[in-house]
């Protein structure tokens, strides 16, 4: 499903139309079957589905004096001496999930199963036993999570509709891990290992969002998720993503947001990545016609950039539901591809047209994606802002990029870009010397500065830094047919040794230089500015 050169898949995230998150407690098999039939008829191929944690593992903690723990129970009933009971899992819910799998198989739908669904749409959902507990770091909670995951995977692994196991929905929202730098790794390792013990045949999907390129910037990071799972995921909503909620939803920056973020995750992680959740977040953010425009842009861009697949959030509107989070969160009520009256929205029609166009044109196989340059994300910068801007600027200049970080072995390329360097670390010495060695062997390197320190610098670039200072105004960049003004973090006074001066400020100080295959610009005018 996720293999290189495979079939680009389309679909959505699914909660039943009649009950949303309460679908397992308010089970209606006929409605679920009708939902899946409607989605299949509109070219939906893949559903991401969620066994809600407290419904599937409804355990309560029973204690004696001084709150000393005695046992877990189903309410007042002891846990049965069965595999399900020992895992704290309700077998009725497992059978309901099995029915969902059967309907999916009937309508040729593939399922991605989010196993630990403890966070959903702005609300926590945990068993009564773990109310008020940090379920990412508490060892007892983790023990029961592992037991549930192993039981569900063991019971459901023979269901042919299941294509992949997902750790859960945005599990990095389920609790803080800042007190222990390895807690995120430990939780991910425990759940992914539990899956693989019971089923090594299917890929393990991260299900996380908002990962960072470096661990120093966030304990949930691309590298460690890629180490422990097979497939990374993006949830690229402009409203919740820095630098993205600036333009109308259907314009260039938002049209490429999902693609840029997914390529960054996949490139830096060096594993497959796909668009697992996306959408406009409803009529408070965008009208139906522009939602359809965004759908088309994400689908065609995702296809062209080898993003493997795209799932919309979500299948059905939930505007008739009274439970939280729908009672709390206005923005969660009208996110579906289908209205409450079962009328398909323009976004679903756009998805259907895209899918049928691929089939009609025999384009289902994901084409190779050529990259012309490597963008190197460095320490002490806003990696997402710099990477996103670099991706867009490259598009405007007519070429495509792949991403790497300054602490990785770099892929071979004829063109490297080290954008918006800032801070005192930037790139470790051994990595910097290896990059300069690539330049000596014929590669081109473009460095843009946001006040960052590189060493050695003067000799390779053929310049001297005379002094630095705090800026008092934007820097002028004046060259052949060009004059623009750029805000900068630090003002650098340069003098050219043997570098060619491509642009200067109003005082004649070089601000853009070239020496052999090295290009340097002191004010990084556009590659971190998204406002």
Per-range role (PLM):
Residues 293-325:
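Substrate-binding cleft of secreted/luminal carbohydrate-active enzymes
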Residues 191, 370-397:
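Short, charged N-terminal beta->alpha structural module
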Residues 208, 219-252:
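Aromatic- and acid-rich polysaccharide-binding/catalytic face
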Residues 2-229, 292:
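Active-site mouth of glycoside hydrolases
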Residues 331, 343-358, 516-518, 522-531:
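Extracellular ligand-binding/catalytic regions of CAZymes and related secreted enzymes
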Residues 394-410:
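A short, well-structured beta->alpha microelement
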Residues 423-531:
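A conserved amphipathic helix/loop scaffold
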Residues 172-177, 243-245, 261-294:
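Active-site clefts of carbohydrate-active enzymes
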